[in-house]
Amino acid sequence: TFCSCETKYMYDKIPVAEAKSLNIEDFQPCCTTPLYDAMGMTLTSTHKHVQDMMDAMVVVTIITDGLENASCEYNGKTIKELVERLRGEGWTFTYMGANQNSVEVAMSMSIRNARNFDYSNEGTRASMQKDSSTRMNLFGRLAKWKTAEMKGCCGVLASESERRNLYANMADEAFDEEENK
């Protein structure tokens, strides 16, 4: 979590199996919102960590209760450029904002998938459930594709670039399907 008074990492590059569930207390905002700095630092660090991994799928979810108002190192232009570059590498992004026009904010950063939520326990819970359903949908699609690929029904194996684009498209389709439920 990032705020103008501190940066607190809940998890930093640990296996999913070792991560514990987060609760509402883990997301208590304070101070102001250096959203661009939070994104820039996290995305840059994650990119360094995964850049040499083969067949990596990177799914980024940005959750915020506020708009950018305190960044020092990154600005809207640099974040938009970073997101566009990473999307070109197959990364997928979801922006979830409380009590704001999340679609407009996300679009300003070249993020396709956006979701609004009410800043309340129920609003947060519902948004997290929807995001979880989206991820499960995505991983179901990925499992089917991987199974078909292993059985050789897909013909020639996809190149790394094709694979990353396929993963990003699967993520977008999963998001759209869950939004339309």
Question: What does each of the following model-derived ranges do?
Answer:
Residues 1-181:
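Acidic, low-complexity intrinsically disordered regions
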